[in-house]
């Protein structure tokens, strides 16, 4: 049973009226992905061959229809909009979570660790060399007394 009469459809803006002529509203829960009642804002799958069918309306046209429907207080009769799902299930981008950075920034920790290891190693070698040098000088020179 249609919700709108012809007079009511004629009073709506052209784009919104055309939408309700093509896809007459029943109730908000009536929009599904079944072939007999497809949501014109969402992509669906053909049950016979499994191919994806693009949405009937683009995101821009969806936004225009929703704006007009909100102005007329009819947005509850429209099917679920594609952009609503995008925001709620959006994944965090890898680049924002772990930014790539420059090579010097990415390898900074590794470079500092290598530098610290080399410095501690060189200090050990230096102290070892000094100790050997002192022992050698004590052995080589007899005490004058």
Swiss-Prot record:
Swiss-Prot/TrEMBL keywords: Mitochondrion, Ribonucleoprotein, Ribosomal protein
Highest taxon in the source lineage: Eukaryota
Biological-process GO terms, alphabetical: mitochondrial translation
Subcellular localization: Mitochondrion
PANTHER family attached to this UniProt entry: 54S RIBOSOMAL PROTEIN L25, MITOCHONDRIAL, LARGE RIBOSOMAL SUBUNIT PROTEIN ML59
Function: Component of the mitochondrial ribosome (mitoribosome), a dedicated translation machinery responsible for the synthesis of mitochondrial genome-encoded proteins, including at least some of the essential transmembrane subunits of the mitochondrial respiratory chain. The mitoribosomes are attached to the mitochondrial inner membrane and translation products are cotranslationally integrated into the membrane.
Name of this protein: Large ribosomal subunit protein mL59
